[in-house]
């Protein structure tokens, strides 16, 4: 089971989807993953399982012979699915359905790197802060859009890999490159935009810009 998603899986099974077994193919394949790791790694790790189960399903023949993959993703899982399609399987991905995926990154990632974990964590704050700053996945959640308010005013600028307080420039650059790679691959597929179905919330307070100051950050 995938903790927190049991109800969704049960609902899909009630609609007739079934998980594969050793003896029978299935068309519902839960993919829990280690969210701390790079989304590049996770997409590559998923590929053999997805492609194996897709081939088993297609082997039934008939109307299943041309089956394709539909991803149902929450939060960062949508970035993993986009990376999978871009690097491993655009030809057999039919849809990517996402719930609350930060497609172009999240200002929360900047906050975590620059300011650390919340103070309410008490004595665990330092440990959680150090852990967060070591995660490739957190850096791949950094905003890819122009989000920095310059001191002089004027147009917003993109994040500078060396400009985030307490950030590792190499890890920041790698995280930003993740978005560049995925977006570049997607632009070569004129059908890709129609494959993504993003379900989002409205009227939710969301930080979208940051100003770096001598004393820290202003969101």
Annotate the PLM regions:
Residues 1-135, 139-143, 149-159, 201, ...:
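N-terminal non-catalytic accessory region
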Residues 165-219:
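C-terminal subdomain of alpha/beta-hydrolase-fold enzymes, centered on the catalytic histidine
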């Amino acid at each position: 089971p995938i903790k927190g998603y049991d109800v969704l899986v049960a609902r899909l099974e009630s609609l007739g989807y079934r998980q594969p077994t050793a003896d029978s193919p299935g068309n519902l394949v839960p993919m829990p993953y280690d969210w701390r790791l790079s989304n590049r790694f996770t997409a590559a790790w998923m590929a053999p399982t997805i492609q194996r189960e897709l081939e088993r399903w297609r082997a039934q023949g008939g109307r299943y012979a041309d089956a394709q993959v539909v991803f149902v993703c929450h939060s960062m899982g949508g970035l993993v699915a986009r990376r999978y399609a871009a690097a491993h399987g655009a030809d057999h991905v039919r849809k990517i359905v996402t719930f609350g995926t930060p497609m172009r990154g999240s200002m929360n990632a900047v906050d975590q790197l620059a300011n650390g974990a919340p103070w309410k964590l008490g004595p665990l704050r330092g440990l959680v802060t150090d852990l967060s700053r070591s995660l490739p996945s957190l850096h791949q959640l950094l905003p890819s859009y122009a989000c920095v308010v310059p001191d002089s005013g004027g147009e917003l600028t993109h994040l500078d890999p060396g400009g985030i307080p307490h950030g590792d420039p190499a890890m920041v650059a790698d995280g930003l490159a993740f978005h560049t790679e995925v977006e570049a691959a997607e632009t070569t597929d004129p059908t890709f935009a129609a494959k993504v179905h993003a379900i989002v919330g409205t009227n939710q307070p969301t930080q979208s810009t940051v100003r770096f100051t001598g004393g820290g950050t202003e969101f």
